[in-house]
């Protein structure tokens, strides 16, 4: 009898929760319409996978890509609308959040074609791979629009769990298992530290969880200069630092880059940084408004360490993926300059512009690595020697993306860095910008070293991998080369006409 009553109570409680969730979705669903499109795509993928055989694999790519493109279209139609807070203050929709959501969707849209040939050659499960990619994208989008501490914690965990599963997708690879274990342990530790910081912020503000209400709560409790806020700031910086992977929170990055499947690395290398940057700007700028000097100092230290260590250690690497791992650590140091400058002097606009260029440069380089790896089976830098003699298009594409990453004119990377450094200089960050300029010169050195290997024409320097190089006969080869071409074009041409891009980025105040 008692069990029967408890069961009825459980059913009633579950029904109330479901009806409340349905009510929220019914009245607030339009505010998360791009996210709802991805959710619908996920459900459609699961339905088709459970009712069809492997012959319908092209449909999986089509559904995933289409849902991402429709979601991008929905975002563009919603551009310039008034800021809206929905779901009882949990989610905010404004131009600033939407441009980061657009960047995440763009990353995912470009990464799916990069994965087609790799998945077919390695015979990985296609449905689960695409499900994890779309779910991670969904988590990143919710993180960009998160407006309270609970959502800011849950959304990146959704992204992180999918990242762990993707990095360990090749279960038989020992390096992949080792990288996943390190990624999982460090990710769990960083999440606990992040929650610890949130708890201090929650208590100091008098029990507030919305970002703007936390500021009001700190004013009411007079705790905005208390030691608890300092503890919260340090803990949250450590937690977000793991997602951004600046030095010294970069230990997981080289191993995960080297051990994970290359398309997964391409996806994680850009989406995680875009989502974490969006979250960092809002967390530091709003709840820690009264501690701006402190978090500026912390981020300056992280930026200096990242730019110096990332670029210096990259010189010594022999693996292309590990080299790009340390290069990404240096690149996030440049992005942090934009976060420090903030809304004044177009800091956010320069950061967003540089991230757009970084997406194309980085994904273009990884597309070249995917193609070369599938056709030769190697990732070693010295094995790229003489690639120009066998595949001029691939060698030239690699060279352009690497030169753009290094910031050589007239490529997009040069203009992105130029505007970022100029904004930092105007804001008085002279030492930080000087370090950025010096480390950019260092990065040009190791990028040019690889380009020299690519373009060498002497027979004695051409490796057996390149000598036996063969193009892939698969038709899906067209999709990866299409993505590579798009990324190469985006790494070169937009730099010449930056004004429209900057104008759009400057319209993203929150």
From Swiss-Prot:
Keywords, sorted A to Z: Chloroplast, Membrane, NAD, NADP, Plastid, Plastoquinone, Quinone, Thylakoid, Translocase, Transmembrane, Transmembrane helix, Transport
The way this protein sits in the membrane is described as:
Multi-pass membrane protein
Any one Gene Ontology cellular component term annotated for this protein: chloroplast thylakoid membrane
Top EC class of this enzyme: translocase
Q: What is its main location?
A: plastid
Chloroplast: is it a keyword of this entry? yes
Enzyme Commission (EC) number: 7.1.1.-
Which one GO biological process term can you cite for this protein? ATP synthesis coupled electron transport
| GO MF annotations in UniProt | NADH dehydrogenase (ubiquinone) activity; quinone binding
Q: Which domain of life is it from?
A: Eukaryota
The record, for PANTHER family, names: NADH DEHYDROGENASE (PTHR22773)
User: Could you tell me what this protein does?
Assistant: NDH shuttles electrons from NAD(P)H:plastoquinone, via FMN and iron-sulfur (Fe-S) centers, to quinones in the photosynthetic chain and possibly in a chloroplast respiratory chain. The immediate electron acceptor for the enzyme in this species is believed to be plastoquinone. Couples the redox reaction to proton translocation, and thus conserves the redox energy in a proton gradient.
The annotated subunit structure for this chain is:
NDH is composed of at least 16 different subunits, 5 of which are encoded in the nucleus.
Q: Which family does it belong to?
A: Belongs to the complex I subunit 2 family.
Entry protein name = NAD(P)H-quinone oxidoreductase subunit 2, chloroplastic
- Supply the gene name: ndhB
């Amino acid at each position: 009898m008692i069990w029967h009553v408890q069961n009825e109570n459980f059913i009633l409680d579950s029904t109330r929760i479901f009806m409340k969730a349905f009510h929220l979705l019914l009245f607030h669903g339009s505010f998360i319409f791009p996210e709802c499109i991805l959710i619908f795509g996920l459900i459609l993928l699961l339905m088709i996978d459970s009712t069809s055989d492997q012959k319908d694999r092209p449909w999986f790519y089509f559904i995933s890509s289409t849902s991402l493109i429709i979601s991008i279209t929905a975002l563009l139609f919603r551009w310039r609308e008034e800021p809206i807070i929905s779901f009882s203050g949990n989610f905010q929709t404004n131009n600033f959040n939407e441009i980061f959501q657009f960047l995440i969707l763009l990353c995912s849209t470009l990464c799916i074609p990069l994965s087609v040939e790799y998945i077919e050659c390695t015979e990985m499960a296609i449905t689960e791979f695409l499900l994890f990619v779309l779910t991670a994208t969904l988590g990143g989008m919710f993180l960009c629009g998160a407006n309270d501490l609970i959502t800011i914690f849950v959304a990146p965990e959704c992204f992180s769990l999918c990242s762990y599963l993707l990095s360990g997708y090749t279960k038989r690879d020992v390096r992949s298992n080792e990288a996943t274990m390190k990624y999982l342990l460090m990710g769990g530790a960083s999440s606990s530290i992040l929650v610890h910081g949130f708890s201090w912020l929650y208590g100091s503000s008098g029990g507030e969880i919305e970002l703007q209400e936390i500021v009001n709560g700190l004013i009411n409790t007079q705790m905005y200069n208390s030691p608890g806020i300092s503890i919260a700031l340090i803990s949250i910086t450590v937690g977000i630092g793991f997602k951004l992977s600046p030095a010294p929170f970069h230990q997981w990055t080289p191993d995960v880059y080297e051990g994970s499947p290359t398309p997964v690395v391409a996806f994680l290398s850009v989406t995680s940084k875009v989502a974490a940057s969006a979250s960092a700007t809002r967390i530091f700028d709003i709840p820690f408004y009264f501690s701006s000097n402190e978090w500026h100092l912390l981020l300056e230290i992280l930026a200096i360490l990242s730019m110096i260590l990332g670029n210096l250690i990259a010189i010594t690497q022999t693996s292309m993926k590990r080299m790009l791992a340390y290069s990404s650590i240096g690149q996030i140091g440049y992005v942090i300059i934009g976060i420090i400058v903030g809304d004044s002097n177009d800091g956010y606009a320069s950061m967003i512009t540089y991230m757009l260029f970084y997406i194309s440069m980085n994904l273009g380089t990884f597309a070249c690595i995917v193609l070369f790896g599938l056709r030769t089976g190697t990732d070693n830098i010295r094995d790229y020697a003489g690639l120009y003699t066998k595949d001029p298009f691939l060698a030239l594409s690699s060279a352009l993306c690497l030169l753009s990453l290094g910031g050589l004119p007239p490529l997009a990377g040069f203009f992105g860095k130029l505007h970022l450094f100029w904004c930092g200089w105007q804001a008085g960050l002279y030492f930080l910008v000087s370090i950025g300029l010096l480390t950019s010169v260092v990065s040009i050195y190791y990028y040019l070293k690889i380009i020299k290997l690519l373009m060498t024409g002497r027979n004695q320097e051409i490796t057996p991998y390149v000598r036996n190089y063969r193009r892939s006969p698969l038709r899906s080869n067209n999709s990866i080369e299409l993505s590579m071409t798009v990324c190469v074009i985006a790494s070169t041409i937009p730099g010449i006409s930056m004004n429209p891009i900057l104008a759009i980025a400057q319209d993203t105040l929150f």
